[in-house]
């Protein structure tokens, strides 16, 4: 199942990027989303 492995890998990459951004720059959603 290469498709399954590829999907799992993409999910891990996206999750890693999301958490990296979230922890680097704490969420200010609604307050200053213009920047």
UniProtKB/Swiss-Prot annotation:
GO terms (BP aspect): photosynthesis
Species of origin: Prochlorococcus marinus (strain MIT 9313)
UniProt key word tRNA-binding: no
Quaternary structure and interacting proteins, as annotated: PSII is composed of 1 copy each of membrane proteins PsbA, PsbB, PsbC, PsbD, PsbE, PsbF, PsbH, PsbI, PsbJ, PsbK, PsbL, PsbM, PsbT, PsbX, PsbY, Psb30/Ycf12, peripheral proteins PsbO, CyanoQ (PsbQ), PsbU, PsbV and a large number of cofactors. It forms dimeric complexes.
Entry's family note: Belongs to the PsbT family.
Keywords in alphabetical order: Membrane, Photosynthesis, Photosystem II, Thylakoid, Transmembrane, Transmembrane helix
Residues that span the membrane, as ranges: 3-23
GO CC annotations, alphabetized: photosystem II reaction center; plasma membrane-derived thylakoid membrane
Name of the protein in question: Photosystem II reaction center protein T
Highest taxon, organism lineage: Bacteria
Summary of the function given for this chain in its UniProt record: Found at the monomer-monomer interface of the photosystem II (PS II) dimer, plays a role in assembly and dimerization of PSII. PSII is a light-driven water plastoquinone oxidoreductase, using light energy to abstract electrons from H(2)O, generating a proton gradient subsequently used for ATP formation.
Subcellular location: Cellular thylakoid membrane
Annotated membrane topology: Single-pass membrane protein
Primary localization class, coarse: membrane
